[in-house]
């Protein structure tokens, strides 16, 4: 494992614990031996107030490669969400998460999670990743928002 990646992720964890947006979660997972795995984080993004996503808490896994922060983490909703920019596998399609697009090593975990929260309610229809959600979003916004509200209710924190 890269010392650069681990040191950056340790800084990220410290900064997150000191200050993070209300309702968001970002925690490194534990290895079988109980030690912390900084390369694999369990996160959760709350649906934004005043949107059909409100009330939901959407679980996301963030996986970092050894060359982080040169390369972005892979962000994957578990379980996958109904959304035009979420692949059926759950992987998020967002330009700041793509090395050859808008990724920059200075982007923080907090910025990534806030960017994904923004994307939930403002899909990028130029870059669809899920045919069904994309089609319904474009053709029947009322039905799309109904499905999103049902999903938010399903993923409401207990």
From Swiss-Prot:
Positions marked as site (Substrate binding): 100-101
Q: Where does the record place the site Interaction with RANBP2?
A: 4, 25, 57
PTM summary: Phosphorylation at Ser-71 significantly enhances SUMOylation activity.
Q: Which Pfam families does the UniProt entry name for this protein?
A: UQ_con
Q: Give the enzyme's EC designation.
A: 2.3.2.-
**Region (Interaction with SUMO1), start-end ranges:** 13-18
| Compartments where located | Nucleus; Cytoplasm; Cytoplasm, Perinuclear region
- Cross-link type Glycyl lysine isopeptide (Lys-Gly) (interchain with G-Cter in SUMO2), residue numbers: 18, 48-49, 101
- Recorded consequence of changing residue 127 to A: Impairs catalytic activity
Q: How does it assemble?
A: Forms a complex with SENP6 and UBE2I in response to UV irradiation. Forms a tight complex with RANGAP1 and RANBP2. Identified in a complex with SUMO2 and UBE2I, where one ZNF451 interacts with one UBE2I and two SUMO2 chains, one bound to the UBE2I active site and the other to another region of the same UBE2I molecule. Interacts with SETX. Interacts with HIPK1 and HIPK2. Interacts with PPM1J. Interacts with RASD2. Interacts with TCF3. Interacts with NR2C1; the interaction promotes its sumoylation. Interacts with SIAH1. Interacts with PARP. (Microbial infection) Interacts with human herpesvirus 6 IE2.
Q: Tell me the function of this protein.
A: Accepts the ubiquitin-like proteins SUMO1, SUMO2, SUMO3, SUMO4 and SUMO1P1/SUMO5 from the UBLE1A-UBLE1B E1 complex and catalyzes their covalent attachment to other proteins with the help of an E3 ligase such as RANBP2, CBX4 and ZNF451. Can catalyze the formation of poly-SUMO chains. Necessary for sumoylation of FOXL2 and KAT5. Essential for nuclear architecture and chromosome segregation. Sumoylates p53/TP53 at 'Lys-386'. Mediates sumoylation of ERCC6 which is essential for its transcription-coupled nucleotide excision repair activity.
- Name listed for the protein in its UniProt record: SUMO-conjugating enzyme UBC9
């Amino acid at each position: 494992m890269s010392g650069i990646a681990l040191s950056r992720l340790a800084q990220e964890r410290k900064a997150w614990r000191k200050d993070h947006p209300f309702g968001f979660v970002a925690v490194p997972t534990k290895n079988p031996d109980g030690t912390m795995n900084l390369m694999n984080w369990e996160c959760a993004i709350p649906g934004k107030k005043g949107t059909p996503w409100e009330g939901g808490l959407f679980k996301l896994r963030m996986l970092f490669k050894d060359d982080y922060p040169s390369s972005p983490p892979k962000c994957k909703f578990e379980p996958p969400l109904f959304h035009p920019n979420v692949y059926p596998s759950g992987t998020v399609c967002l330009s700041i998460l793509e090395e050859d697009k808008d990724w920059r090593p200075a982007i923080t975990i907090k910025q990534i999670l806030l960017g994904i929260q923004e994307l939930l309610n403002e899909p990028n229809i130029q870059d669809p990743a899920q045919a069904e959600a994309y089609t319904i979003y474009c053709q029947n916004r009322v039905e799309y928002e109904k499905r999103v509200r049902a999903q938010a209710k399903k993923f409401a924190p207990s």
